[in-house]
């Protein structure tokens, strides 16, 4: 007669099982947060005239900026980022982090992995420069809102989520549309 007592999983089996967002390239993206500083930024005097303040608005690729701010041990109370929404549309900046069509296998992880790999080191560094009482605001569209929330929860902790602000898009369809209409972002 067979035993009805379940066999506990081996240590190696439980070590491989965990809950979290996983994608190809995640460990390399995590390592990018601690990569050596490759460029520096400087204050734009034309944009900084009549500014006798410690506050700053920095408009740049935020990865090298965050690397430098973290290296300087700078701390901020508010961080606002507006990353690419990964819509594939043509903008001044790259907004298509999807793998090339011939590389797609249709799996969810591969579809979004490049975008997630772009975001992770930036959020890790943002966490380093955010004060303990600080807030980070992230503008993101519907294409990556779920992934953004998962990565933010991983980096900052689920308990740090304060809320989601929604704004109504201009120019959305009427209520009599044939299909569901996305009215917010």
For the regions a protein language model found, what residue spans apply to each?
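Conserved Class I SAM-dependent methyltransferase catalytic core
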Residues: 110-166
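Polar, glycine-rich mid-to-C-terminal structural blocks
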Residues: 170-171, 177-185
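Conserved nucleotide-binding/hydrolysis micro-motifs of P-loop NTPases
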Residues: 84-88, 142-145, 169-172
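Short, solvent-exposed loop/turn and secondary-structure capping segments
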Residues: 88-96, 148-150, 164, 176
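Short secondary-structure boundary/capping segments
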Residues: 73-75, 93-99, 151-157, 179-183
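A generic secondary-structure signal marking the coil-to-beta-strand transition
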Residues: 54-56, 163, 185
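DnaQ-like (DEDDh/DEDDy) 3′-5′ exonuclease domain used for proofreading
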Residues: 1-81, 85-121, 125
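A general structural signal for short secondary-structure junctions and capping/turn motifs
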Residues: 48-49, 128, 178-181
